[in-house]
Amino acid sequence: MEFFDENLPKNGDTVVVGLSGGVDSTLTALLLQKKGCKVIGVTMSLWDGRVPENLGDKVLKPSCYSPSEVTNIEECAKFCKENNIEYHVVDVKKEYNDCVLEYFKAEYRSGRTPNPCIQCNRFVKFGALLEGIKKLNIEYDYFCTGHYAKIVRPAEGLWGTDVHPCMISSAIDQSKDQTYFLYKIPSEILEKVRFPLASMSKKEVFELAHQFKLEAANREESQDFI
């Protein structure tokens, strides 16, 4: 079956970008702004402090769910202020606890291997976060993130119908491809989702980030979960 890549945001579009403080999301926001889009940055607030920061001789490493969230938000706010980008923090702690942490514990106790990132993307990042944006009365054309994946649409209708739903497809950089973590996102959500880094390699992302002198280019790559 033949598939067509969906168009990326264009000059004049209003785009909400999910910012984590990392190089991928930061560069995504900057590239869209330079393209002429009105960019609005949003960050999820997940950390509730329930896990001790010091566990004997071990310390929680920086990750999406950790005390480093405070620093991440500060860096996102600084980046947005420097680049004249509207910025919001959306509290999704309850949804993260219910859909990710409780799921993780239940799977682990049942002897199964959990995948918290799939749950988070399906129910939090592309679920609760978008609901939070709606509650802020933010209107937008697209929601973008720095994921390495792309949105495609089948040329022919599925199952002999005229239905041509948006789907997740592999990014150019196979070593960073994240389609596995995104595959549960419903097609109706994907209609307004775009991944501007789909055609770039991680090497190109870092090169551009250094060229634009982004502080995020000097950070270590983010780690999933805790």
Label every PLM stretch briefly.
Residues M1-K184, R194, K202-V205, H210-Q211:
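ATP-dependent adenylation/nucleotidyltransferase module used to activate substrates
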Residues E188-K192:
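A short, charged helix-loop
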Residues A198, K203-I226:
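Anionic-ligand-binding alpha/beta catalytic cores of soluble enzymes and soluble regulatory domains
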